[in-house]
Curated annotation (Swiss-Prot):
One annotated GO biological process: riboflavin transport
Highest taxon above the source species: Eukaryota
Biophysicochemical property: pH dependence: Optimum pH is 7.5.
InterPro entries: MFS (IPR011701), MFS_dom (IPR020846), MFS_trans_sf (IPR036259), Proton-linked_MCT (IPR050327)
Function of the protein: Riboflavin transporter involved in riboflavin (vitamin B2) uptake. Does not act in the transport of monocarboxylic acids across the plasma membrane.
Keyword Lipoprotein assigned: no
Full protein name: Riboflavin transporter MCH5
Amino acid sequence: MSSDSLTPKDTIVPEEQTNQLRQPDLDEDSIHYDPEADDLESLETTASYASTSVSAKVYTKKEVNKGTDIESQPHWGENTSSTHDSDKEEDSNEEIESFPEGGFKAWVVTFGCFLGLIACFGLLNSTGVIESHLQDNQLSSESVSTIGWLFSLFLFVCSASCIISGTYFDRNGFRTIMIVGTVFHVAGLFATANSTKYWHFILSFAIVCGFGNGIVLSPLVSVPAHYFFKRRGTALAMATIGGSVGGVVFPIMLRSFFSMKSDTDPTYGFVWGIRTLGFLDLALLTLSIILVKERLPHVIENSKDGESRWRYILRVYILQCFDAKAFLDMKYLFCVLGTVFSELSINSALTYYGSYATSHGISANDAYTLIMIINVCGIPGRWVPGYLSDKFGRFNVAIATLLTLFIVMFVGWLPFGTNLTNMYVISALYGFCSGSVFSLLPVCCGQISKTEEFGKRYSTMYFVVGFGTLVGIPITGAIISIKTTADYQHYIIFCGLATFVSAVCYIISRAYCVGFKWVRF
């Protein structure tokens, strides 16, 4: 940092140079020194020298060598740093050097999360195939909107249950909560396989399986942050690629089973397809439990005097699991709002993507192929932006992908999405951009959160996201209720505007951190 760029009231002086300020004519009574300050604290020195007031921020040698900036809470649009080194993380005062940033154990943990997320996100990406089969078979007597509420409830329970596992993970670690979530996830799938009535599917799939899926999701997304800081975007992108892999493999497997027929049991293919999915998810989640281990110490909160064990559990894991105070942090608040609108947009668009295609004369098989293209292109869509985010900044790349997705929807899909050839291109672009959104948004949340609090903050965010998903899909269904061409155009506009609002929220969140200037953030 050049001394020419400093004003007399904001001088940064290395520790070894501080004696130069203490000339005989200084007013010694105006020098304040904290003898208890350690290597991580700064000393504030104010002196009167040659009739000029000088305020010096004195850093330890360790901090000077690291280029540390100790900053106050930023105001709206304020650029909180006078310089931004190319290799500095702008928003964190954590000991960056303590993160492994790689190594055998770190990548084994990432691979374990990858396997677990194949099961979690793979099921989420297979709901369209399951919905289509139920609409034509077990639930053929129910309306489309009624069946839609089943899957909307599944997504809500999945998102909302993250809040329980996130709090437990921060306090107790990975393994126990993963075992509990795996039991619910697999048991829900086996119960779904034998369901025949609407209320059966509500209990087995939406509630039990949705709860288990959400329970395992939060720890699997949180653990890579324990091993990576500078390369966190790349690591989480590698882990979440499992969602796209599952989104490609699971629907193909389920459609193959669903096509099986039996003279004595018309549900034979569905039953064994869901059971096979349950066995496969059990194997994947078990391997994840074996391979993954958290690194950072747990957040410990002792019980109060005279507090019973059950009152302690109720207070810590139920009443305090929602981090309401986090919303007082404006950068976190707008990050959550941005995630709500992005998830609402993408989930609503994908839920009715096949219906849109068939309404424009595209066959059911080709519509299924378009969905497969989205999932396949989501694989590089998760990795490439994740890698770029470590080079150019997580928020910067996330905002760029959201704006690109908005352009794809308004410039590509809305005017040209009327024939199969165009839809192939649109599906590829949409899959790439939406995949990057899913992998980058948790990283952005992690960047503005302490690592040991990430699980709770992430789960709190997705608890709120669950409400957005719960109402977003039915609203989209109401928009296309008549299924006219104009209805589907309004459906694209609705999803596109939600994407744009998401980008604006992330821009505001970034502004609270570093202002509007171009820096790597």
